[in-house]
């Protein structure tokens, strides 16, 4: 007997009910460096987090020879934020960013300022909190949370909000 999967909305609503409601803390002291050097190999697979996410999110990913077959040279992204198909080519002007679904600046003012560095590094490199997306959409978002910004693709709004709630619940952010 297989149990039916619970709809994501039910789980997200339950998690949202459990999130604390508090005012944002000051942004004083925030800097990207508070979350460790970008794109570490936190899972010790020989690949940095950026390439792990590109391999996960791109189709037809072509990997560079050597270096643990980690470095993604090219591929195609079905961008959840815009709904567009985007060709990725390493070295060209960045058309794809890796987005922190819960932006690090937002995490800082909703609890991460008081964390140990190891926990901030974990959040910054957690695949749950990372998506390959259109660079322009990511940069338009900045440090906004789901109350302030939603992806331009309306069919992704619910999944985006649910993912942000899941990250905030996992790390006990507000």
Model features per residue range: what roles?
Residues 1-47:
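N-terminal module-boundary/linker segments of secreted carbohydrate-active enzymes
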Residues 26, 49-50, 111, 119:
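Glycine-rich, flexible loop/turn motifs
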Residues 19-23, 27, 34, 39, ...:
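Sec/Tat-exported extracytoplasmic proteins
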Residues 5-9, 52, 58, 89-91:
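Short low-complexity stretches enriched in small and charged residues
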Residues 12-16, 27, 50-54, 74, ...:
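Extracytoplasmic/secreted envelope proteins and their assembly/folding machinery
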Residues 81-174:
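Domain-level detector of nuclease and nuclease-like folds
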Residues 32-76:
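N-terminal carbohydrate-binding/catalytic regions of secreted carbohydrate-active enzymes
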């Amino acid at each position: 007997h297989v149990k039916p999967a619970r709809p994501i909305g039910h789980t997200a609503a339950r998690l949202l009910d459990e999130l604390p409601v508090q005012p944002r803390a000051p942004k004083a002291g925030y800097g990207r460096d508070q979350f460790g050097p970008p794109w570490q190999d936190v899972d010790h697979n020989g690949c940095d987090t950026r390439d792990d996410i590109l391999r996960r999110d791109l189709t037809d990913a072509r990997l560079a020879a050597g270096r643990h077959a980690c470095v993604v040279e090219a591929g195609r992204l079905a961008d959840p934020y815009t709904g567009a198909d985007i060709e990725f080519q390493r070295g060209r002007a960045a058309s794809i960013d890796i987005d922190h679904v819960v932006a690090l600046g937002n995490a800082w003012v909703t609890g991460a300022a008081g964390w140990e560095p190891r926990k901030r590094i974990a959040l910054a490199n957690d695949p749950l909190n990372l998506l390959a997306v259109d660079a322009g959409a990511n940069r338009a978002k900045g440090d906004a949370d789901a109350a302030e910004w939603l992806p331009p693709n309306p069919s992704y709004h619910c999944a985006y909000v649910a993912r942000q709630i899941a990250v905030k619940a996992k790390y006990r952010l507000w």
